[in-house]
Regions:
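Alpha-helical metal-binding/catalytic segments enriched in His/Glu/Asp
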Residues: 108-112
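Extended beta-strand/beta-hairpin segments
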Residues: 1-106, 116-201
């Protein structure tokens, strides 16, 4: 083989390697390595996420998320993430941003979707579309103090997924089932947890 032919073959192989993308955008070797590492060193599984919130005006506030602890160290996000929250005018706000309960819907939907992507990649299923519609029903008589018999939060949340991928419907549905079984946000919403409130004044 000539030198030019060898160089051409090398360039073609390099280009082909660059074109190979992880299935569903998930780095499965790292995913499996992480699972093995945590299995062997359970202390690596301990994480602490945190955020700071600042009141701006009325029902408008801003939350900043910068870093978290886990895997034996402290990690900074690539960008300091800032999220605003407010109430719409009908709820005596200025509608600068979504309401906190709408962010809760976002948290649940995005957590389930992330799980679906990871699980599909681990099972060798290529996804073409994952879309969800999520709704929460709430009776404001609770938070307005009108009735102690009405809970303050959502009484029901409904999620409808549409999936398209290289697998039969049963396997696609199984992805959602497994994601739900392992979702941190779903767990918090359906099982609850203690919340500690400290006040400094």
């Amino acid at each position: 083989m000539s030198t030019s032919a060898s160089a051409s073959t090398s360039r073609s192989a390099t280009a082909a390697n660059r074109e190979v993308k992880p299935l569903n955008g998930v780095d499965t070797p790292t995913l499996f390595a992480t699972i093995d590492a945590v299995r062997n060193q359970p202390e690596l599984a301990e994480f602490r996420f945190r955020a700071t919130n600042q009141w701006l005006d009325g029902t408008h506030s801003r939350t900043t998320i910068e870093a978290f602890d886990g895997a034996g160290g402290t990690h900074s996000h690539r960008n300091n993430e800032v999220y605003a929250a407010d109430h719409p005018a009908v709820l005596v706000g200025a509608d600068h941003a979504p309401t906190p309960v709408e962010f809760l819907l976002h948290a649940l939907a995005s957590c389930l979707t992330a799980g679906i992507g990871n699980i599909a990649a681990a099972r060798g299923v290529k996804l073409r579309e994952v879309r969800s519609e999520i709704e929460g029903e709430i009776d404001l008589r609770g938070i307005l103090g009108i009735s102690d018999e009405v809970r303050n939060g959502y009484r029901k949340i409904s999620v409808r997924f549409t999936l398209d991928g290289d697998a039969p419907a049963e396997k696609l549905k199984a992805l959602v089932e497994q994601s739900t079984a392992r979702s941190a946000v779903f767990d918090v919403l359906t099982r609850g947890l203690p919340v500690e409130i400290e006040v400094r004044a």
